[in-house]
Each structure stands twice: as C-alpha cells, then as structure tokens.
C-alpha cells in the first residue's frame, strides 16, 4: 500500500477498491477501502466532491475522511482524519493539493503533487509539507500497460534518516465492474 510515497503495507500486497456515484452536474460521492495499512489495519475512506471544466481547466474539489475501524489498532472514526483535495489540470499536466483539516496534523500538513502524463507514461513529483519543517519529497514514474494493468516506481529524494529511501515498486491490476 503506497501512500504519498510511503509504504504503509510494509511490502505486503493490498487489496483495494471503490464504489462511486456520479451526477451529471459533476458532483460525486463514494467509498474507497483497502486491506493494506500494516499499522492501522483495514481502512475505508468516505468522499464527496465536484469535478468538471472551468474554462479550459479540469478542476476537482473534494473532502475525504479516512476511517480505521480496527479498535485494537487505533479505532479512527469518520471525521477524525479529514483532507480537502483540490486538483487543477490542463491537458497532460495536473497539480493537486491535499490539505489536512482534521486530525493530529490539521492545518499543519499539506501534500502537493505535480503530474505530467503522456500516452501511457506518467511522471509525478510529490512534496510533503509540515509547518515545522522536515518535508520529504518523492518522484513516481508510471507506465499504464492497458486499462487494467499499470506499473510504477516511487523514490524519495531526501537525505533523511526518518524515511525509507529505497525505491518502491508498484503493480496495479484493476477489475472494473462497469465500462
């Protein structure tokens, strides 16, 4: 489970999926779940937002709450951890801001990505930003073989003993329920 460059699954594979409902206006809501957080256990996220065109820009704004129901591993409920996510893109380029609104890092942590996609290839830079400093960044390179199978490698670009700076390799296989 690779989250913003960090391996939350301690190298173990994770199963994840989501169910999303969309409206013609661009509004959407959904639930995302994963088996893969080695520290906090099973995770599910509730989200709602809006995505669409604003002039020539692709814009998406959403709120996410992260839930870890395993009582013995933290019992973090809906609303305990909340991020606002704003994404703006034009053509193959996209910038996304994740702002912590609730939780231990509320109003003290943000994460920003800049991504460029060309055909089946992508390059992304992600930067963690903490108010007190110590902000690791990472690069992720991806290749989307087809609609279902993708590969990526992620590498932190920081000389810091607090992050694992070994490259992380990701294989992603998707089984869509609809087309």
PLM regions: where:
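Outer-membrane beta-barrel proteins
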Residues: 1-179
């Amino acid at each position: 489970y690779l989250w913003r460059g960090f391996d939350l699954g301690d190298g173990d594979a994770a199963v994840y999926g989501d169910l999303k409902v969309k409206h013609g206006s661009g509004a959407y809501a959904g639930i995302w779940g994963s088996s893969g957080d080695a520290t906090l256990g099973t995770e599910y996220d509730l989200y709602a937002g809006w995505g669409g065109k604003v002039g020539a820009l692709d814009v998406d704004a959403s709120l996410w709450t992260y839930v870890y129901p395993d009582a013995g591993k933290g019992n973090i409920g809906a609303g305990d951890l909340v991020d606002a996510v704003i994404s703006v893109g034009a053509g193959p380029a996209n910038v996304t801001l994740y702002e912590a609104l609730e939780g231990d890092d509320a109003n003290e942590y943000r994460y920003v990505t800049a991504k460029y996609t060309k055909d089946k290839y992508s390059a992304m830079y992600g930067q963690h930003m903490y108010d007190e400093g110590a902000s690791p960044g990472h690069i992720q390179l991806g290749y989307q073989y087809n609609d279902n199978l993708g590969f990526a490698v992620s590498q932190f670009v920081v000389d810091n003993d607090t992050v694992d700076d070994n490259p992380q390799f990701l294989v992603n296989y998707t089984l869509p329920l609809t087309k």
